[in-house]
Amino acid sequence: QCANSMGKSFNMANPFLDAESAELRMNFVHDSIAKNGIAVLIRKTPAKIRLQKDKIIAEDYIRLNIHDFLLKCVEGHCNIIVSGETGSGKTEFIKYLAAHTKENEKIITIEDTLELHLDKIFPHRDIVAMKTNNIASYSDVLVTCMRQNPRWILLSEVRSAEAVMAVRNSISSGHNILSTIHADKAESIPSRMYSLLETNQDVEQFLTTIHRYVQLGVHIKGYYSQKYKRFHREVSEVVEFYVTDDNKAEYKILYKKTPDGHETVANPSKYLIGYLESQGVIMPQDILVKEEFREVKSDNISNDNNDFIVDNSTYRNMNNGVGTINSGNVVQSNKQVLNNIPNYNNQSNIVYSQNIPNIYGGQNIPRPVNINNINNS
């Protein structure tokens, strides 16, 4: 019935079928291929923003400061590509980011299967939904899209050479993009895009272009959570891409959560800060580490409350907090308490960058504080 309604064939000669309805995506594999019977996958794509700030913060989908940082980057017109496996929630996340674009900024969505539904979610906004097909390719739609003069172009998924070129041409022409891609980690996004190309383009030139115009990569991971007793999704990586002053393509991991619960946080580079300033968005260079840092004594060192772990060595906090900072990371273990200051997020082995100058009473050594009491001053 799905095949008939779409005017397609589903038989031994055409054993694969992709179908869609208003809020469903369906994939069928004929029993000539799937030997235990027709294989069916149905995914719901409702016309609503399913992610809500309070809920995703409370359920450890994303850290509060990472959340606020990303929305600040959307405000500053950063190009963002979200990576992850099938079903990890990439599309829902770019819908959430798109919901925080400015109301007067025109959005055009380009999809081969409609699942963003932003035109229905925000009927009062100037949003145009375009769908590719056998007649209108990504390239054809993009040419028309450019003539519509959008501020934002949303490509639901980069999974072909044509889609890669659509992204590159969009960002190179000054438009802003939000898109998704299948990749194993955020830092692999540029190389994954290159691997989808069918032509022998110069790899260094291509990667430099992506690093120059795509500011951020975000990776979303999905897994069964013992804590929540259900399938759980979370933002596990945020990576900044940039090109150095001597024209080298580089990346910087701003946030990473490993499977064993370790988390690292780093501040954005001067390149991202400068780009945001050019867009009229002022962001403190210590926006991430400053708001997130907490110091808690490790279990495996002395009980005098003066020692804590920096990388793989022990750093002694001399003179009760007055001294010099060694670069490195501070490790916070689950439920540890120092001077009655607990691990407020109840996470295991949280790792934070330590190079944070002058934010606690003008001293260079961070002291135990409640994260909720830290401000931007």
Model region roles, listed by residue range:
Residues 1-76:
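P-loop NTP-binding catalytic core
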Residues 230-377:
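NTP-binding/hydrolysis catalytic cores, primarily Walker-type P-loop NTPases
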Residues 209-237:
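Helical/strand "switch-coupling" subdomains that flank nucleotide/phosphate-binding cores, especially
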Residues 90:
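Conserved lysine of the Walker
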Residues 87:
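Walker A (P-loop) phosphate-binding loop of P-loop NTPases
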Residues 77-80, 96-209:
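Switch/coupling sub-region of P-loop NTPases
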Residues 84:
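The Walker A (P-loop) glycine that initiates the GxxxxGKT/S ATP-binding motif of P-loop NTPases
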Residues 93:
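Hydrophobic positions on the alpha1 helix immediately C-terminal to the Walker A/P-loop
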